[in-house]
């Protein structure tokens, strides 16, 4: 599997998604649901209490020397969640209370994941238009603007300024308000009504367009299939399938909409990397490359790393990443349940015909079991020394042409890992939005609750001295503020920057 030092990150992303799918299938929610308002209140409170207890017992953050405020933050989230739970009257209220608890924790790798069948919930509603955040406000997207003028900017609703409303109606229940990228991905949900009983649905909003201010009375209606298509079209635009195109001579567009590829997409990635490696002499003279990460929900960062090795040269990428992660350690929280999970993971990988992954997982499980036997909180994953290398090949010529990376606001997980790789090189230019951020708590298992309504997110490990610090956001060098994030819009941004770089400009 290449350098053993990469084993943790490689297998974590390559295998754990499939393993987690199998693990999550072990138990399905019961058919019986709480039958009264009192029962829903009791369920919300009980599930939040159990989530806190499970987190205390198994989450690595509880004993993280670099995060002494973890438990205080968890306790504050508990108090807030229980305040909401005490007001719950139905299923939608249960979901909202859990969301409020999670938002107060502020980490997507902690808290509760609701397991209720979405078809049982009331249909979400919308006012007949879609908005997108573009750095300084919400703008009506042209893809769905029938009930409000396209490109109009929201000023306020019901006398409440737009930003204040987004904080109370959106970020109090989802997303992470301190991360700029989350505004780009989450703020638009202001105009999606999920029947949250703790927030008022906007009734009358004011907008501005071309110097004119006007009011709009909102007419809420169920989101149907046509509306869903409009939401999809407005979310980061028209992302392409995995592969490379040449929108104009000598400018190459590389689409990476997923790092969790299916069989056809895996073949497309391999073909792309072969094309870059085999034709590298030609591509050294490219005007620019554009790497498009729109729609990328993470997965296995190996695909980005392999592309980078083909483009910049394997030895350069490997050396840059080795320096970036030279101090990184991986600490596995050695609780009995975490240890059992990693041991199960090893058996599951064996069953899937992944012997290298199974061996790696088994080593971690054995280390966790040994730590338990010694009363230690963590098993620290051992870094294997580099294997004896073959004599180095002559270095390939450096790739020095501009590489523009289109970053969506919800870029996280393996998408952030890709930015870790690409930004090792000074010819990389990030365009689009600020990214999201990750905590250092990873490899999440799900602890299903007896209620069947939710599962606790339990990371099994944490990074110490990671090259990218906890909660670090990648800022775009060029913000793309047009409401429409189409390929044409993004190409205009790239061409403008290329023109600026011309001698004499």
Residue ranges of model-derived segments:
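N-terminal secretory signal peptides that target proteins for export/translocation
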Residues: 1-8
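Bacterial N-terminal signal peptides
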Residues: 11-22
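Flexible, low-complexity junctional segments that flank or bridge functional domains
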Residues: 27-343, 347, 402, 417, ...
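Short N-terminal or domain-adjacent regulatory/targeting segments
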Residues: 197, 227-229, 374-391
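Low-complexity, serine/threonine/proline-enriched polar segments
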Residues: 322-378
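Extended, charge-rich low-complexity interaction segments
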Residues: 349-367, 459-481
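Extended C-terminal subregions enriched in glycine
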Residues: 350, 402-424, 429-438
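Short, conserved helix/loop micro-motifs enriched in His/Cys and acidic residues
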Residues: 391-406
């Amino acid at each position: 599997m290449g350098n053993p030092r990469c084993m943790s990150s490689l297998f974590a992303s390559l295998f754990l998604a499939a393993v987690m799918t199998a693990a999550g299938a072990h138990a399905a929610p019961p058919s019986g649901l709480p039958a009264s308002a009192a029962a829903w209140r009791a369920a919300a409170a009980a599930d939040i209490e159990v989530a806190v207890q499970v987190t205390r017992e198994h989450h690595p953050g509880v004993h993280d020397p670099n995060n002494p405020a973890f438990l205080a933050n968890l306790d504050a989230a508990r108090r807030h969640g229980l305040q909401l739970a005490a007001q719950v009257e139905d299923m939608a209220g249960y979901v909202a209370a859990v969301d409020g608890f999670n938002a107060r924790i502020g980490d997507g790798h902690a808290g509760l994941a609701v397991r209720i069948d979405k078809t049982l919930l009331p249909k979400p509603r919308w006012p007949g238009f879609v908005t997108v955040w573009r750095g300084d406000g919400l703008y009506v997207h042209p893809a769905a603007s029938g009930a409000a003028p396209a490109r109009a900017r929201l000023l306020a609703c019901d006398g409440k300024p737009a930003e204040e409303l987004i904080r109370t109606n959106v970020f109090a229940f989802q997303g992470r308000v301190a991360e700029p990228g989350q505004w780009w991905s989450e703020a638009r949900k202001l105009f999606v009504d999920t029947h949250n009983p703790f927030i008022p649905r906007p009734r009358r909003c004011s907008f501005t367009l071309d110097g004119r201010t006007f009011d709009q009375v909102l007419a809420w209606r169920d989101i149907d299939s046509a509306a869903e298509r409009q939401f999809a079209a407005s979310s980061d635009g028209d992302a392409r399938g995995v592969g490379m195109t040449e929108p104009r001579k000598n400018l190459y567009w590389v689409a990476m909409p997923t790092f969790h590829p299916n069989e056809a997409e895996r073949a497309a990635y391999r073909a792309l990397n072969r094309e870059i490696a085999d034709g590298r002499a030609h591509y050294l003279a490219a005007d620019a490359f554009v790497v498009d990460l729109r729609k990328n929900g993470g997965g296995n960062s190996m695909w980005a790393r392999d592309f980078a090795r083909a483009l910049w040269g394997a030895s350069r990428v490997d050396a840059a990443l080795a320096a970036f992660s030279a101090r990184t350690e991986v600490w596995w929280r050695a609780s009995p349940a975490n240890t059992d999970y990693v041991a199960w993971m090893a058996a599951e990988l064996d069953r899937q015909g992944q012997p290298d992954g199974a061996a790696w997982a088994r080593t971690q499980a054995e280390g966790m079991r040994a730590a338990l036997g010694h009363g230690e909180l963590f098993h620290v994953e051992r870094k294997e020394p580099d294997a004896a290398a073959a004599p180095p090949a002559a270095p390939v010529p450096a790739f020095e042409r501009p590489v523009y990376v289109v970053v969506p606001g919800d870029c996280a997980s393996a998408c952030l890992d890709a930015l870790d790789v690409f930004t090792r090189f000074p010819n990389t230019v990030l365009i689009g939005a600020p990214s999201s951020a990750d905590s250092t708590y990873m490899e999440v298992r799900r602890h299903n609750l007896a209620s069947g309504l939710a599962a606790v997110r339990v990371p099994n490990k944490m990074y110490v001295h990671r090259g990218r610090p906890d909660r670090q956001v990648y800022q775009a060098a060029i913000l793309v503020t047009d409401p429409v994030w189409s390929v044409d819009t993004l190409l205009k941004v790239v061409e403008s920057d290329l023109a600026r770089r011309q001698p004499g400009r």
